[in-house]
Curated annotation (Swiss-Prot):
It comes from the Eukaryota. It comes from Mus musculus (Mouse). It is found in: Cytoplasm; Nucleus. Interacts with DMPK; may enhance its kinase activity. PROSITE patterns: SHSP. The keyword NADP does not apply. Residues 55-163 form the sHSP domain. Keywords: Cytoplasm, Nucleus, Stress response. Gene3D superfamilies: 2.60.40.790. GO terms for molecular function: structural constituent of eye lens. Belongs to the small heat shock protein (HSP20) family. This is Heat shock protein beta-2. May regulate the kinase DMPK. InterPro entries: A-crystallin/Hsp20_dom (IPR002068), Alpha-crystallin/sHSP_animal (IPR001436), Alpha-crystallin_N (IPR003090), HSP20-like_chaperone (IPR008978).
Amino acid sequence: MSGRTVPHAHPATAEYEFANPSRLGEQRFGEGLLPEEILTPTLYHGYYVRPRAARAGEGARAGASELRLSEGKFQAFLDVSHFTPDEVTVRTVDNLLEVSARHPQRLDRHGFVSREFCRTYVLPADVDPWRVRAALSHDGILNLEAPRGGRHLDTEVNEVYISLLPAPPDPEEEEEIARVEP
């Protein structure tokens, strides 16, 4: 028993963690959430927290991400529970919102694992990329949101007046002018 450790005691049996040792834990990451998964109770399994609803219909939403557009805001939800907060990066480039995460190779009970993903959203034309905010919940759900109406939908044209600068005097002409004027 000294060589075997149980990392978590939930549920209360030691065999729970090792009930099916040949099966890898859930490998989905960087994918969106369904609305029913946001408010469902969670299971504490291994080293991460997952919504219960994800276990039932896992194949139905593979590759999907939750995206909400309302009158007042743009909102996206992403499950990044396999990553620590310092491994997740959110940035905007022009009208693109890019979420990326990467963690180095780690040892788990099945061997070694490393993960990396990048998801890019196109922001609506009326969302100002400088006003995007990100919040990470305790169970690894990344909430990205920005108010809508921050930019004008119409293209504004600003015509800039071009002023003409006088040409610099020619050095030869300056010498001629100096000789003529006594």
